[in-house]
């Protein structure tokens, strides 16, 4: 008998060690038309009033597969620092960054679904509303820009990798989750003011705080032309009223052949010479940008 009990206890302990924290699908109050799924990773040692980090996947991916990608180290960061990561999963193969639903505050698209996930995460995990952060690569980088434009009041800072300006993938026919060759190829160019107007039009009349933006791009990006880096910088410099030239630059930082350009406390660009699509996430540098 005793032997059997010991075996049972030992088995339970082993099972709980093996199970531990895991990416889990969570239902959330969602008033958007988009039925994007919400997945969450709560580390075993979550801190009180945890920061919430939204990690947005690329095309032909999902919350589950992105969270297993070795170049996307946010689960490990969560284990180490105790913040919670929210992993939205797109209803289409890419995020909808082309239709009016998604390109507008309250439009009902994927961006609104993700905003609902942020609200729910803050409520369910008693998250810190002053420490909500967004990151993503490629299509997730595009969505990061769109979220910053459509739901600025929910987000403190963004660190986005290899995306395009907010609104650059707009579909002339209003299509959902459409690819846009003009933008991806780097031919969608506009003045800083025109790009800034695109952001302002996504939430007309908004005059509150906006997230601090960190923009990464590789010079050898063959999927989303490097010109999209310059266009994104033009966009946010205009929104923040910064000059077009960086106020300070650091060569070979945070890595060799990367250059960091600071435009003001709300905008930093990091251009990776020789790096293709998509620039791997640098957990340390993104966490630093988030103040974690
Ligand atoms: C959707 O829900 C959010 C809160 O999660 C709320 O702020 C917003 O007003 C709602 N929108 C509509 C159209 O009901
Ligand atoms: C692609 O996006 C640009 C803006 O970046 C827009 O002017 C153009 O109409 C879009 N193309 C299509 C086919 O929707
Ligand atoms: C990431 O950035 C930090 C500085 O924030 C730097 O020290 C580190 O070398 C970078 N990581 C990699 C893998 O290059």
Language-model features and meaning:
Residues 134-136, 161, 216:
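Short beta-strand immediately N-terminal to the catalytic nucleophile in serine-hydrolase-like folds
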Residues 51-58, 162, 217, 273:
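The conserved beta1-alpha1 loop
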Residues 2-52, 83-84, 130, 135-139, ...:
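A domain-start/cap signature at the N-terminus of enzymes
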Residues 46-95, 168, 225, 279:
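Short substrate-entry loop that stabilizes the transition state in hydrolases
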Residues 87-109, 171-172, 176-179:
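Cap/lid segment of the alpha/beta-hydrolase catalytic domain
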Residues 215-217, 221:
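Short beta-strand/loop motif that positions the catalytic acidic residue
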Residues 44-49, 97-139, 149-155:
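Gly/Ser-rich "nucleophile elbow"/oxyanion-hole loop immediately N-terminal to the catalytic nucleophile
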Residues 159-168:
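Active-site nucleophile loop of the alpha/beta-hydrolase fold
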